[in-house]
């Protein structure tokens, strides 16, 4: 099965930039759909599912990488999946979200909540009713944040990565950040790039980390989750043209922009050898291009090559 073998991703050099050696860890190549940190997060979840829990319930937005990966893994493992979707307005327009359409085709049952109800997660009345209807359901938090998901993310780094000074990762729930913080060497620093402006990262990850030796760069959210600018899209297209590495517009694109911008402005202070973790999420490119097209803006041209 998908998760039954140990996998190391390749490290691809981006060359030297103003004296800094930059390498990207191609976690996006682990699997076509369950790529990057989604592979790591779900590995032990699916391996440890009890036989009497044939249903897995989880949460996500209309363009959630986590929902898409969970739906694919469920289909491969023969596990019925339920997706609790943020925003009841999506109930009658699934076809407008490539992500939700994919989840539906892979057998995931979708339920839509108002944003107020969604904020309550498993405590929402609608979710409680589902759990009563299916009492043996396995509940997976949004983004997969859990002890065994962090355990999977602790397998990202290997002995070859000990030469680097800084390990960079984009942040959603903080699960991948936690896995990296738990495995870096004393001379290394984890630099996190949040996808949104919020101050709760430490609160989210504290139960899962062995130390708090990480730093956050919060200047590269580009206005918030799933928001982009023409400058960011142009950077991502140029990056692909130069390196033939696709980036996603929600997480890795913003992180790479930030790293190069900090180096350019001589504000990078975390050593000369930089390892960037590519967390996948490329399924989010198609819906972003749809959004950009509707606004008459430039798109990520490399989507046709994925």
List the predicted regions and their residue ranges.
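PLP-dependent amino-acid enzyme catalytic core
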Residues: 1-306
């Amino acid at each position: 099965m998908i998760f039954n073998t140990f996998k190391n991703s390749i490290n691809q050099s981006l060359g030297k930039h103003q004296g800094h050696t930059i390498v990207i860890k191609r976690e996006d190549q682990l699997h076509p759909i369950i790529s990057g940190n989604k592979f790591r997060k779900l590995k032990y979840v699916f391996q440890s599912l009890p036989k009497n829990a044939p249903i897995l319930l989880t949460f996500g937005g209309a363009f959630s990488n986590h929902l898409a990966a969970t739906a694919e893994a469920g289909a491969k493992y023969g596990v019925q999946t339920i997706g609790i979707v943020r925003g009841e307005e999506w109930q009658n327009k699934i076809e407008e979200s490539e992500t939700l359409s994919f989840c539906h085709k892979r057998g995931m049952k979708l339920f839509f909540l108002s944003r107020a109800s969604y904020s309550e997660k498993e405590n929402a009345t609608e979710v409680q009713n589902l759990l009563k209807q299916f009492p043996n359901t396995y509940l997976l938090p949004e983004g997969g944040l859990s002890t065994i998901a962090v355990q999977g993310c602790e397998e990202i780094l290997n002995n070859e990565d000990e030469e680097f000074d800084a390990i960079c990762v984009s942040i959603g729930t903080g699960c991948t950040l936690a896995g990296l913080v738990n495995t870096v060497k004393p001379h290394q620093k984890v630099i996190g790039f949040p996808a949104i402006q919020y101050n709760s990262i430490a609160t989210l990850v504290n139960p899962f980390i062995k130390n708090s030796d990480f730093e956050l760069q919060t200047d590269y959210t580009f206005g918030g989750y799933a928001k982009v600018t023409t400058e960011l899209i142009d950077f991502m297209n140029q990056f692909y043209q130069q390196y033939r590495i696709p980036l996603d517009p929600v997480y890795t694109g913003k992180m790479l922009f930030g790293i190069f911008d900090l180096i350019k402005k001589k504000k990078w202070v975390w050593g000369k050898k930089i390892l960037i973790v590519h967390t996948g999420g490329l399924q989010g490119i198609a819906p972003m291009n749809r959004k950009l097209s509707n606004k008459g803006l430039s798109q990520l041209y490399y989507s046709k090559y994925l």
